[in-house]
């Protein structure tokens, strides 16, 4: 794993979060390098700057290294990004008092003179971010967005024009480009919330823009709902909850149980919380955590059932470490006799991991693409 970041005289040691000693993934990419290199070569002044979608703090650490008092307004939807940025500032002995933190639902300040962004995979979420910027940025404010060259096309530039202002792309460097957008000073309204029904379970669901499977029930969740375990469950964790549909259904099936919703995405947790209220479930039975798996779950929460549909992406990276951490956390936090009940793509071979961790694994259901697996803590 490469940890030494070096661009235009800026030297840093950067780690992903959580740290993975055996991983070949690094905490930054060439788009981070390109964006920081462009700023240094243009001798950018230390003006109030928003940094958006900075995976593990490469951009904020780089600017703090250049000017320790650079006023930075860091926006992220991912708890691991927040924790990783903190970790890397500490590792490089950089100040933190020049940073202010924002989620993707918070309103950024109106005194911004520059915005730096990484292009997210989810373009609906990106459009939401640009729309929010249109509501606070004065005309002529520069927004610099770094991305892989293959991700940049006329359709993407049209998204800029529709939601913020005209944009153009730089020349390529290490297969990346930096898009420069100039705010036109015209505030745009946020997209209206869309609510959709799952009639067979008498549920109404809505998703914020960065939540997986917007406006429909994804196939993995559907097969999971059709194969939920039976038992006398009192404490249930919906781990990686997304919009919360699994936890909502278990609240219907086990009305005496406390349901704990956990996700790395703040928008996911907010969506689950809104859906809990929308479906008029008991306010004292739903609990919501923006967290890196179960790292900071209160000590008194000892679930007897953990439901999990693990992601196998972290940003642009394809990785199984999130699933591995979810399974480890489940084994650590489950009561004796408690159950981990998961859904996954067949090709991911999660049964091997569960057998290794729990010394048991049962196939509950499967189809051509997905498999439901269950392991018990003994």
UniProtKB/Swiss-Prot annotation:
It is an enzyme of class 2 (transferase). Specifically methylates the guanine in position 1835 (m2G1835) of 23S rRNA. It is found in: Cytoplasm. Transmembrane segments: none annotated. Belongs to the methyltransferase superfamily. RlmG family. It comes from the Bacteria. Keywords: Cytoplasm, Methyltransferase, rRNA processing, S-adenosyl-L-methionine, Transferase. HAMAP family: 23SrRNA_methyltr_G. Its main location: cytoplasm. One of its GO terms (cellular component) is cytoplasm. One of its GO terms (molecular function) is nucleic acid binding. The keyword Transferase applies. This is Ribosomal RNA large subunit methyltransferase G. PANTHER family: RIBOSOMAL RNA LARGE SUBUNIT METHYLTRANSFERASE G (PTHR47816:SF5), RIBOSOMAL RNA SMALL SUBUNIT METHYLTRANSFERASE C (PTHR47816). Pfam families: MTS (PF05175). Its EC number is 2.1.1.174. The lineage of its organism: Bacteria, Pseudomonadati, Pseudomonadota, Gammaproteobacteria, Alteromonadales. Gene3D superfamilies: Vaccinia Virus protein VP39. It catalyses: guanosine(1835) in 23S rRNA + S-adenosyl-L-methionine = N(2)-methylguanosine(1835) in 23S rRNA + S-adenosyl-L-homocysteine + H(+). It comes from Shewanella sp. (strain W3-18-1).
């Amino acid at each position: 794993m490469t940890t030494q970041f070096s661009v235009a005289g800026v030297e840093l040691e950067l780690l992903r979060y959580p740290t993975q000693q055996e991983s070949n993934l690094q905490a930054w990419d060439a788009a981070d390098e390109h964006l920081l290199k462009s700023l240094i070569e243009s001798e950018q002044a230390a003006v109030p700057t928003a940094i958006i979608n900075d995976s593990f703090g490469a951009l904020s650490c780089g600017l703090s290294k250049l000017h320790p008092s650079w006023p930075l307004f860091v926006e992220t939807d991912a708890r691991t990004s927040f924790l990783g940025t903190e970790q890397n500032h500490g590792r490089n002995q950089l100040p933190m008092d020049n940073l202010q933190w924002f989620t993707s639902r918070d309103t950024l300040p109106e005194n911004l003179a520059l915005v730096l962004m990484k292009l997210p995979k989810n373009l609906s979420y990106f459009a939401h971010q640009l729309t929010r910027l249109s509501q606070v940025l004065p005309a002529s404010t520069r927004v610099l967005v770094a991305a892989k060259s293959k991700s940049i096309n006329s359709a993407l530039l049209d998204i800029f024009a529709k939601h913020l202002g005209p944009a153009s792309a730089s020349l390529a460097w290490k297969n990346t480009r930096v898009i420069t957008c100039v705010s036109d000073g015209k505030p745009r309204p946020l997209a209206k919330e869309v609510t959709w029904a799952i009639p067979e379970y008498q549920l109404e669901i809505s998703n914020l823009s960065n939540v997986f499977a917007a406006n429909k029930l994804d196939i993995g969740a559907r097969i999971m709902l059709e194969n939920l375990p039976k038992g006398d469950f009192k404490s249930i964790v919906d781990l990686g909850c997304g919009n919360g549909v699994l936890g909502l259904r278990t609240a219907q099936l086990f009305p005496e149980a406390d349901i704990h919703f956990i996700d790395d995405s703040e928008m996911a947790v907010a969506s689950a919380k809104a859906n809990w209220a929308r479906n008029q479930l008991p306010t004292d039975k739903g609990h919501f955590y923006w967290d890196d798996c179960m790292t900071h779950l209160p000590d008194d929460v000892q679930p007897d059932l953990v439901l999990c549909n693990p992601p196998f992406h972290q940003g642009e990276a394809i990785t199984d470490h999130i699933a591995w951490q979810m399974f480890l956390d489940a084994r650590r936090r489950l009561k004796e006799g408690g159950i981990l009940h998961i859904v996954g793509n067949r090709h991911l071979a999660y049964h091997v991991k569960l057998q290794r961790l729990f010394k048991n694994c049962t196939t509950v259901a499967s189809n051509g693409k997905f498999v439901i697996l269950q392991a018990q803590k003994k």
